[in-house]
């Protein structure tokens, strides 16, 4: 509630809001239409901004240096931000307000200094708050399209991760039998 009081006044726009869009990629067999999206925990608006609030009960806030880092496999990759940025990219095309993705880590929200605002920037450098995702949307979509092309490419081989801890919360573990 402290975070909401600090952000107030705002208008609650929705909870558990499904957002989806179709994305086309090229394959050797022709074009493939994919539905991408997910469920946004909460949407609220204030002025000319629509804020995505993604609640997190665990994990640690991470600050990506840039969009590329979201698509680079690494143990410290800020994967929660990827999900929220995907929602933001979809919403940027569905309405005219600025879209501000945010992550609300429940276990950290009681701190006076905590802010759910996502920031980007290099370590020990000034950070840029992501208050208008439109500035990042084109690069995010370009890299997402490239990733999906790679996933559906018959030339690429995909193997299971060696780190089975990553499988604990994976939506696809039933497919790979982990």
Question: Model-derived features: where do they sit?
Answer:
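RecB-family 4Fe-4S metal-dependent nuclease core
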Residues: 1-178
């Amino acid at each position: 509630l402290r975070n909401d009081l600090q952000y107030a006044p705002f208008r609650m726009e929705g909870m558990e809001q499904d957002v989806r869009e179709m994305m086309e990629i090229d394959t050797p067999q022709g074009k493939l239409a994919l539905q991408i999206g997910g469920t946004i925990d909460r949407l609220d608006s204030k002025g000319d901004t629509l804020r995505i609030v993604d609640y997190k009960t665990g994990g640690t806030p991470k600050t990506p240096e840039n969009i590329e880092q979201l698509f680079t496999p690494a143990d410290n990759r800020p994967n929660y931000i990827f999900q929220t940025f995907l929602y933001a990219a979809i919403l940027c095309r569905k309405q005219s307000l600025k879209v501000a993705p945010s992550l609300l880590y429940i276990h950290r929200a009681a701190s006076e200094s905590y802010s759910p605002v996502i920031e980007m920037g290099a370590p020990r450098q000034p950070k840029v708050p992501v208050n208008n995702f439109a500035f990042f949307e084109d690069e995010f979509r370009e890299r997402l399209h490239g990733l999906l092309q790679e996933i559906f490419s018959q030339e690429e081989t995909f193997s299971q991760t060696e780190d089975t801890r990553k499988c604990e919360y994976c939506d696809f573990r039933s497919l790979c039998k982990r």
